[in-house]
Curated annotation (Swiss-Prot):
Pfam families: Ribosomal_S2. Keywords: Ribonucleoprotein, Ribosomal protein. Gene3D superfamilies: Glucose-6-phosphate isomerase like protein, domain 1, Helix hairpin bin. HAMAP family: Ribosomal_uS2_B. GO terms for molecular function: structural constituent of ribosome. This is Small ribosomal subunit protein uS2. It comes from Shewanella denitrificans (strain OS217 / ATCC BAA-1090 / DSM 15013). The lineage of its organism: Bacteria, Pseudomonadati, Pseudomonadota, Gammaproteobacteria, Alteromonadales. The keyword Ribosomal protein applies. The gene is rpsB.
Length: 242
């Protein structure tokens, strides 16, 4: 099972919160103290809370559940996309479109259009169009890919949201809450943990910290999928009892 240690978190700078003047009092239980005007997060809380979240994600993945990685802050986008792809899951790394979950019917139509344009771009359809029309469709394709590329193969609502930066992604969290989708989120000292089922108190800006979170969640999802594949193989008679 995937777990993260205190040392991992210290090396990644997970314990560095925001300046004390920007703090959210709702995060008080998770703050150790302050140093040079910056809040220090109590990793005695973060380590077990993150490991509990990883166990939950692994369990979801073991039941063929879908994990949606969400991180649209500049520092998070690349890590979110890479980690989601590394475990065959889904991501939103550019901008959260209002209604992405709660208005799934409309989003599904946009995904259908994206796939149509993808087909047209490779089957020669674009070549038969005027330059202007081809350019317009290319731009439409790029825009849709940027917004929906990470969820185009999700095939329905996710089973859990993993979020970097609860404050920044509050719309995504609210939509998940409205639909009863569990939320795992990294919550910094300037944010409110409202609507988060699995709170991970930690730095949500430092690249090393973000990569630690995303790679650990990907490893947990892969671990869960491995269990699922092992069970499936046993059911199919591929694994003989020793």
């Amino acid at each position: 099972m995937t777990t993260v240690t205190m040392r991992d978190m210290l090396q990644a700078g997970v314990h560095f919160g925001h300046q004390t003047r920007y703090w959210n009092p709702k995060m008080k239980p998770f703050i150790f103290g302050a140093r040079n005007g910056v809040h220090i997060i109590n990793l005695e809380h973060t380590v077990p809370m993150f490991n509990e979240a990883l166990a939950f994600i692994s369990n979801v993945a073991s039941k063929k559940g879908k994990v949606l990685f969400v991180g649209t802050k500049r520092a998070a986008g690349e890590a979110i996309k890479e980690s989601a792809l590394s475990c065959d899951q889904y991501y939103v790394d550019h901008r959260w479109l209002g209604g992405m979950l709660t208005n799934w019917k409309t989003v599904r139509q946009s995904i259908k259009r994206l796939k149509e344009l993808e087909s047209q771009s490779v089957d020669g359809t674009f070549d038969k169009l005027t330059k202007k029309e081809a350019l317009m469709r290319t731009r439409e394709l790029e825009k849709l890919e940027k917004s929906l590329g990470g969820i185009k193969n999700m095939g329905g609502l996710p089973d859990v949201l993993f979020v970097i930066g609860a404050d920044h992604e509050h719309i995504a969290i609210k939509e998940a809450n409205n639909l009863g989708i569990p939320v795992v989120a990294v919550v910094d000292t300037n944010s409110a943990p409202d609507g988060v089922n699995y709170i991970v108190p930690g730095n949500d800006d430092a690249m090393r910290a973000i990569r630690l979170y995303t790679s650990s969640v990907a490893a947990a999802a892969n671990s869960g999928r491995g269990q699922d594949l092992a069970v499936q193989a046993e059911q199919d008679g591929f694994v003989e009892a020793v």
